[in-house]
Amino acid sequence: FRLSNLAAEKIVDDIESIFENKKNFFEQDHSKATYANKINKEEGRIDWNDKAENIIGKINGLYPVPGAWFYFDGARYKILKASVSKNSATPGKVINDNIEVSCGTNSIKILEIQREGKKIQNIKDFILGTKIKKGVNLINA
């Protein structure tokens, strides 16, 4: 709520500055402009060999669509929230009962997840009904 108030104040200040000719505008240098391709769903696939920090970046950067995801037992799972942990094991291995997954460097603690066709769940609720357990490896699962 505070951020929206600050943004509203800033917009009013900027509009006033424009009308008072206090803003300097510069045309973009088109020779330095770059093009970003459309993000496709496949870019959201998680590579467990990557660093945990990079995977968290993918989760945050691709949220909510297309999302960061992995396959397990024929179903696609989208991770919506996660955090970095310092534990490690073989990349892709679930290393504890809270579904913490080891990555190339460190691990991620999954906090919120969604199985395809199902509702979003916090990890505590998800654990109660999943086959993803400690010791399972999510690479090629």
Give each language-model segment a name.
Residues 49-141:
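An anion-binding loop in the catalytic cleft
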Residues 1-85:
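Active-site-proximal loop/hinge segments within enzyme catalytic domains
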